[in-house]
Amino acid sequence: MNGHLPVMLGEVCQLIEPVLGIGDVFIDATLGAGGHSEAILMSSQGALLYGIDRDAYALALARKRLSGFADRCKFVHDTFDKFDKYLSNLHPKVFLFDLGMSSMQIDNPDRGFSYMKSGPLDMRMNESDKITAKEILNGYSETALIRIFRDYGQERYAKRIARQICKARSVSELVTTCQVSQLIRDVCPPHIRKGHPAKRVFQALRIEVNSELLFLRTALEKALDLLQVGGRIVVLSYHSLEDRIVKHLFRSVSVSQLPKGFYINKDPEYKLIGKDLKNPKETEIANNPRASSAHLRAVERVHSHSQAEAQIVEPRA
């Protein structure tokens, strides 16, 4: 029904299916077209899905795709950091975050995500949001643009690109993705980098437009707090900025916190799982090249907060 293939579907199901029972709630916080959730609903009979997406078009596709499970699904049009508003004190057994762009978003030039196809400078996941890439590129100061390109795109030519954008917009407003893509291509030495020179800048703009990294940290912290004992959080990230947030947060909750100068025995509330499932197989990458940058991380809650309370132990003699 659409060209989007769920990334690392087998690995995701391998982590999620064993812990989902009848009546258990799982949150697909980035529902997209519903590919992951469809597989999980098929194999985990009796589990209840809360599917969340800020993209109304994607949500409509998922609703249609999952119509056979309508009695077990609730669909929410919102950003994924707001999932707790809809749970009515429920504690989910599973959270899934697939942070990648869907093919249907990238391949539709009218959405403005692609640097390969001409379209409006939009990049909004939720098309009712106010800020667009056009407003950022034509309205932000040169200093602000440099910060965005460096922080969110890790772009080594951030200063050069921002300067050229400000120069170009002083002549006429930047309107299309191809304008910006060509401007970046003209500024950056082609022999220095692999791939398209606009890739990092477009990533940075998309993150800024949609506040992606801020929402991610907030959502993961809420998920860690609400997750049932025995439940799991599974995250697919696609660039180092996302993965760094996930990695550091998961590591921090899966090790004992030992204050300096105290003898304390405290079992961590979470443990890292799925370390052998981090990256897609070569066969999947061959069939779906967009999966090549995927990175899978997961944690399982092994204790409640009260069970993991610190205990003072005697120092060694």
Curated annotation (Swiss-Prot):
Pfam families: Methyltransf_5 (PF01795). It comes from the Bacteria. Coiled coil: none annotated. Its main location: cytoplasm. S-adenosyl-L-methionine binds at G34, G35, H36, D53, F80, D98, Q105. The keyword Cell membrane does not apply. One of its GO terms (biological process) is rRNA base methylation. Keywords: Cytoplasm, Methyltransferase, rRNA processing, S-adenosyl-L-methionine, Transferase. HAMAP family: 16SrRNA_methyltr_H. Belongs to the methyltransferase superfamily. RsmH family. Specifically methylates the N4 position of cytidine in position 1402 (C1402) of 16S rRNA. This is Ribosomal RNA small subunit methyltransferase H. It comes from Tropheryma whipplei (strain Twist). The lineage of its organism: Bacteria, Bacillati, Actinomycetota, Actinomycetes, Micrococcales. The gene is rsmH.
